Amino acid sequence: MVKLRLKRCGRKQRAVYRIVAIDVRSRREGRDLQKVGFYDPIKSQTYLNVPAILDFLEKGAQPTETVYDILKRAEVFKEFRLNQTKFN
């Protein structure tokens, strides 16, 4: 199973995170399938590759709680629901 989760980058006391699609069994810093975004909590900056995220969500990827909150704030799930209604 694939999850959308945060991968820690940056230096000490100055963490930034990449949002990655990664296999559930691999560790946090393990090899990811694809980088789909970036999150800087200090500057409150977020970059999301929305088409890639929607593609992984349609294939059944599960976001972690923190990634879910980031995606919800960016209103990605509205687009996801619109895509779901078009196909059904």
Curated annotation (Swiss-Prot):
Keyword Plastid included in the entry's annotation: yes
GO MF annotations, alphabetized: structural constituent of ribosome
Gene Ontology terms: cellular component: chloroplast; mitochondrion; small ribosomal subunit
Localization, UniProt: Plastid, Chloroplast
Gene Ontology process terms (BP): mitochondrial translation
Chief location bin: plastid
Bridged cysteine pairs (disulfide): none
Keywords: Chloroplast, Plastid, Ribonucleoprotein, Ribosomal protein
Gene3D superfamilies referenced in this protein's UniProt entry, alphabetically: 3.30.1320.10
Keyword Transmembrane annotated: no
Family indicated by similarity: Belongs to the bacterial ribosomal protein bS16 family.
Function comment: Component of the chloroplast ribosome (chloro-ribosome), a dedicated translation machinery responsible for the synthesis of chloroplast genome-encoded proteins, including proteins of the transcription and translation machinery and components of the photosynthetic apparatus.
Quaternary state and interactors: Component of the chloroplast small ribosomal subunit (SSU). Mature 70S chloroplast ribosomes of higher plants consist of a small (30S) and a large (50S) subunit. The 30S small subunit contains 1 molecule of ribosomal RNA (16S rRNA) and 24 different proteins. The 50S large subunit contains 3 rRNA molecules (23S, 5S and 4.5S rRNA) and 33 different proteins.
PANTHER family per the UniProt record, alphabetical: 30S RIBOSOMAL PROTEIN S16, SMALL RIBOSOMAL SUBUNIT PROTEIN BS16M
Protein's recorded name: Small ribosomal subunit protein bS16c
Species of origin: Spinacia oleracea (Spinach)
